[in-house]
Amino acid sequence: MFLRVIDFFQLHLRWYSVGLIFFSFIPIYYSIIVCQPQQFKIDGFELINPVFNKHHSTRSCTSATKSLQNGLIALFIFYALKIYKKVYLIVLYIILIIHFGFEIRNAKSETSRKYIAISTREMFMYYVELLLLYFQNLLLLPYICGGYFLIRHVHRIPSKEEVDRQTLKFKEEARRIKRLMIEEDWHVKEANEDVKNKIEQEGLKRKDMEFEEQLYHLRIEKVKRREQVLKQKLEEKKAKRRQNAERRKKRREIAMEQREQ
């Protein structure tokens, strides 16, 4: 399970880590805040450590220790940002929050510490030391805020097998959609053909009905003509029969007259 961080948070936190490392390891900065050695010379210019050490048997400065811690934390976070597992990022983030809480507690204890028999200059440098200490604690806040958004805006990068599986799934889905579209087109085409056939059948039915109606009228006319022809023939036959009957009647009359004579 690989995780990839959004480039915005990752890039800015890495640049911030580089800046914090550079700030924590400036030699002149350490010559001022580090209690050992007591004096530091650069090109004949002597820098005397302003922080009083007569009340500390360890001869150590809190701000110097804190600066070293910040530098190491920045270096560790710079390389830890290459981790893409969300569980590891959450664990490191919790450790950072716990460390920040302990540093705040140490800063409060350093503030509540009381010194006696110190000069005004030493008191002034004491407050400068506290100011540096709080400032160095505040330098961890971007990691806390950025780490929160870093963990929140983590999205997953699938493995090669999952990509292949997802690609295969997409291809199968594309084939299925294409097949459904072809079937839908076929159904639409079939429905259009059915509608067209129905329209053609209705047109043919109408034509058949018109043709049958025309045939019916033609048959009626033909029957009427036959009836007329039959009537004419009957009338002609009747007329011939009448003529024949009249002829026979005349012949009989002529024959009877001849017999009487």
UniProtKB/Swiss-Prot annotation:
Chain spans, region Disordered: 234-261
Membrane topology: Multi-pass membrane protein
Chain segments annotated as transmembrane: 15-35, 87-107, 131-151
Highest rank taxon of the organism: Eukaryota
GO cellular component terms given for this protein: membrane
Signal peptide per UniProt: none
Biased amino acid composition, Basic and acidic residues: 234-246
This protein's name: Uncharacterized protein F07F6.2
